[in-house]
């Protein structure tokens, strides 16, 4: 699977490029206990999910407890990349249908990497993301993980990515 490139080819030049990005981020956030960041682009198909997956993998390989969150509630894809279930995810938690522990799944590829998929497509993604429950979601994750990486929807297509900015 090319989306999990750094897992499949950890010694490649591409993997080294992701390590370089990690090192630069470490320099910028030095001294911070927890780090939440998102990968954003203006339109679909640019590589947000690819970069999110590989950055999360690099942090997990570095020994950091990492969670990768699929926050594109309108067009979920992260679950396909890892071959895991999307029956419950962020939308389930935000709608009050699942607890945080119920939606966290091990990646099955790296011991320090967990995945939270988007879950079933809700009728009201923007409202769920704007809710107080979403703030609680991120606060709870900060108590469990060193790095929280958010795979977002395209910035110019829906308001969801803008709503997420207050959490990263």
Residue ranges, per PLM feature:
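P-loop NTP-binding module
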Residues: 4-168
């Amino acid at each position: 699977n090319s989306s999990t490139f750094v897992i499949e080819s950890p010694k490649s030049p591409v993997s080294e490029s992701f390590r370089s990005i990690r090192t630069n981020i470490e320099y910028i956030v030095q001294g911070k206990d927890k780090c939440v960041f998102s990968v954003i682009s203006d339109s679909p198909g640019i590589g947000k999910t690819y970069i999110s997956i590989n950055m999360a993998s690099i942090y997990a390989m570095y020994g950091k407890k990492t969670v990768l969150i699929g926050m594109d509630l309108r067009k979920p894809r992260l679950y396909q990349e890892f071959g895991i279930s999307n029956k419950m995810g962020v939308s389930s938690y935000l709608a009050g249908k699942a607890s945080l522990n119920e939606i966290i799944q091990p990646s099955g590829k790296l011991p320090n990497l967990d995945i939270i998929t988007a879950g079933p497509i809700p009728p009201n993604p923007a409202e769920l993301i704007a809710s107080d429950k979403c703030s609680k979601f991120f606060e709870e994750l900060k108590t469990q993980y060193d790095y929280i990486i958010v795979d977002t929807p395209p910035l110019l297509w829906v308001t969801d990515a803008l709503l997420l900015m207050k959490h990263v």
